[in-house]
Amino acid sequence: MTEPPDPTISAVPAVPVETPAPRPDATVMRRPTPLLVLDVVGLTPRLLDHMPHLKRLAQSGSHAPLGTVLPAVTCAAQSTFLTGAHPSEHGIVGNGWYFRDLGDVLLWRQHNRLVAGDKLWDAARRAHPGYTVANICWWYAMGADTDITVTPRPIYYSDGRKDPDCYTRPPALHDELTAKLGTFPLFHFWGPGADLVSSRWIIDATRHIIRTRHPDLTLCYLPHLDYDLQRFGPDDPRSLKAAADLDAAMAPLLDDARAEGRTVVALSEYGITRVSRPVDINRALRRAGLLEVHTQDGMEYLDPMASRAFAVADHQIAHVYVRRPEDLDATRAALDGLPGIDQLLHDEGKKDHHLDHPRSGELVAIAEPDAWFTYYYWLDDAHAPDFARLVEIHRKPGYDPVELFMDPLDPYVKVKAATALARKKLGMRYRMAVVPLDPSPIRGSHGRIPESDDEGPLLICSTPRAVGDRVAATDVKSLLLRLAGLG
């Protein structure tokens, strides 16, 4: 039998049972910190004094010398930044190389599948599914698993005409950018007319994409310093003015990033140093009987498939392809005494410099600090191919910085250029044959490992204490993941 309640004991109010606060849904993830990564080509500590906006960013944030790779050229360095791997692993051994299976030298390819390794965006998406990436003019953009792509892509008409344009993903972005900014200024991106116009267009495109798409990671390539520093050298007043002009053009983009709370990283692939000695490496191989040409209509063309040895010149680096092992000694003998060559790497040397990849030449030549390699292989300018006097980055079997100049020895060069431009505007075929065959005007180059940090690349971050005393090129990927909150 249950006893009745004792009336002398007052009722105790019921204690409400606390309902636990709902746990955050594990599938709801905090957004990564948005990043803007500016590839300011040719930026060095010395140039920073002429770039007040970037310098303030470095002073309020953090900065450090940035190690580079061999070769210190655009495609190899960018591929290392985005994969965290050396050229021996990702396979980008220069801005181009000899495709042995095709028997052809090809530079400035665009398919991202050429780059091996785990890309930055793949690592980011494993940590944060749905991570979005915009690539505005970094190389190997086509076919990459990025959400937004803008990259130079001329229109090649069937009659041989070439008009400026760009490639975008999604495709509708092409007309959107063209309507807002005008046609991509290809002839201001490279060639005798290369100037600030191209970098301004890229900056404006980047601002538009950030404002309308808000990608988690935005990669932006700014080439302006590449032009006058190669034309005139890094210490010339015109080069210092180019640095100041680019800095002023970047200011609105930096302001946009700050207003959005976007972390900014500005880095460079290499520093450009003063040079005065062109080295005709292919002419030396030809005189030694190792390089072969074939002739059509009086013009000589490199015959890489028949040559016992030839070089793919790429600024201060040249991959030397030797068809048979028994020709290695003769090739070395032809190059060992050539003025302007600092080192000739074979298997062990390539391994030491992380260049031991099947795409590399059997030998790799490194120029002395004040020298650089031409691609020229003809011995008489009367037999040069007609493309030698044109801006033809896809036909020349090596890099040609002389394309930045109009021929100073041709009194009619401006008339020729104007005539070609008039024919172009009328929709007629034209040849802009204005490029000199004299390499001596070039005053700046890159490709070697720099002699000092002052001459080398730099990394700046808007976040204080984000970097230590030095950053390796292979550490850029992990740094960006950490800055995004994904490392």
Go through each PLM region and give its residues.
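Glycine-/proline-rich flexible loop or hinge segments
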Residues: 35-40, 59-65, 73-78, 95-109, ...
